[in-house]
Amino acid sequence: WYDCCGFGFRHIISEREFTRSFTMDRKIRVAREEAKADVMLANDTGCVTTMDKNQWIGRSHEQNFTMPIMAEVQFAALACGADPFKIVQLQWHASPCEELVEQMGISWDESKQRFQAYLKEVEAGNIEHLYNPELAYGGTA
């Protein structure tokens, strides 16, 4: 269970099918079907990327094992109430995170609507709408 995620070193380039099948068969499927896990956390960005992105590739090969994959810090930030889009950046993930976010008591749809409104303000050049972390804990802009 605790072996490599499949990213490895040179085989990610030279043996991509090995990497994909290893990730899907030895990690994602086992976590979902045997461990009944709701999420998989990793501290290595290579592991997060490999296990996250290989899920949509796996679907094209009829390996439909879906599992939210995120970095430990992303999960911790969500647990502390951070915005799933502005701060945690879940919109960049290929694995489905919506259900997990809802299980954590955060409305995915409301968060997405706020983020889309925020993007429109930024696109319009309203610089005061850019995220300023100091404002999150009572500082001044």
Feature annotation, model-predicted:
Residues 26-39, 95-124, 141:
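Extended, charge-rich low-complexity interaction segments
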Residues 15-24, 84-103:
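A polyampholytic, Gly/Pro-enriched intrinsically disordered region
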Residues 1-19:
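Short connector loops at secondary-structure junctions
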Residues 19-35, 50, 55-56:
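A short, acidic, amphipathic alpha-helical segment used as a generic capping/interface helix at domain edges
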Residues 48-53, 77-81:
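Short active-site-adjacent structural elements
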Residues 61-94:
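Short, flexible loop segments at boundaries between secondary-structure elements
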Residues 10-11, 51-59, 84:
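Histidine/acidic-residue-rich catalytic or RNA/ligand-binding cores of hydrolases
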